[in-house]
């Protein structure tokens, strides 16, 4: 039996996704051996243990936003937020715990938001929705945006983002694998290991934000890797008024 399945069967995690993430984060042991592959075959489930801090949020993404808010000293109390690329809700989870007043959660997918967040009255969920085409009435009072998009460059949404009338802060997850272009991404097989390429993608994103009237106040490497081990970055932008 796979160890991620065994973890769920033992009641240690509520889903295979969370179990697999814990394995990748090095929190799961089989006997005295640390296991890092969710596909690891288990013969005796009784030898499985979870050590260290268990994931405090509904997804690993929460650790990324937590790090950004702490690094950039951003207070979420009473803020009205839009979470672009909300997915399971890791960013939403962090924001709620830090006193956000309201969240517009937007994602092109469906049925991804964690069950513990889906019915939260502070979350206004817009699934199967492309942020670029969301109605202006939905985002009129938004003052902070968090961004975690995949398979497109974040620069593609800036024309819409800049139109939000009350927007001030933006916390953006920069993913070099989606910013470098399809040719480079294919050359590196989706994992950008070249530091120069990563640096250039960050520069390109900062320049694009600047061209749309945003100041970059800080950039920090994500505390955890993204999919397939990609190094990612978090940036804080402030809209000029």
Annotate each language-model stretch with its function.
Residues 1-46:
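A basic, amphipathic helix-loop patch mediating RNA/tRNA/ribosome contacts
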Residues 77-87:
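Conserved class I S-adenosyl-L-methionine
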Residues 87-92, 109:
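Residues at the N-terminus of the alpha-helix immediately C-terminal to the conserved SAM/SAH-binding loop
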Residues 94-102, 167-168:
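Conserved S-adenosyl-L-methionine
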Residues 104-156:
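S-adenosyl-L-methionine
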Residues 152-166:
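A short, conserved alpha-helix within the catalytic core of class I
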Residues 166-180:
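Conserved beta-strand signature within the Rossmann-like core of class I S-adenosyl-L-methionine
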Residues 176-193:
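Short, glycine-/aromatic-enriched active-site segment of Class I SAM-dependent methyltransferases
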């Amino acid at each position: 039996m796979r160890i991620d399945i065994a973890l769920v069967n033992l009641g240690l995690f509520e889903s295979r996704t969370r179990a697999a993430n814990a394995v990748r984060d090095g929190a799961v042991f089989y006997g005295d051996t640390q296991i890092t592959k969710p596909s690891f075959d288990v013969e005796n489930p009784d030898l499985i243990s979870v050590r260290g801090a268990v994931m405090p949020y509904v997804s690993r993404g929460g650790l990324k936003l937590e790090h950004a808010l702490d690094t950039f000293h951003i207070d979420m109390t009473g803020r009205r937020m839009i979470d672009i690329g909300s997915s399971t809700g890791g960013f939403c989870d962090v924001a709620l715990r830090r006193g956000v007043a309201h969240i517009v959660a937007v994602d092109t997918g469906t049925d991804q938001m964690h069950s513990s967040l889906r019915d939260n009255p502070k979350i206004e969920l817009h699934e199967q929705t492309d942020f670029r085409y969301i109605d202006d009435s939905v985002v009129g009072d938004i003052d902070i945006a968090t961004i975690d998009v995949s398979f497109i460059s974040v620069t593609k949404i800036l024309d819409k983002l800049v139109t939000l009338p009350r927007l001030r802060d933006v916390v953006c997850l920069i993913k070099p694998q989606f910013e470098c272009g399809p040719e480079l991404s294919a050359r590196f097989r989706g994992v950008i290991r070249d530091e120069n390429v990563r640096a250039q993608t960050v520069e390109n994103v900062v320049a694009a934000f600047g061209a749309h009237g945003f100041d970059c106040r800080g950039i920090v490497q994500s505390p955890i890797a993204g999919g397939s081990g990609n190094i990612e970055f978090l940036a804080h932008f402030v809209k000029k008024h």
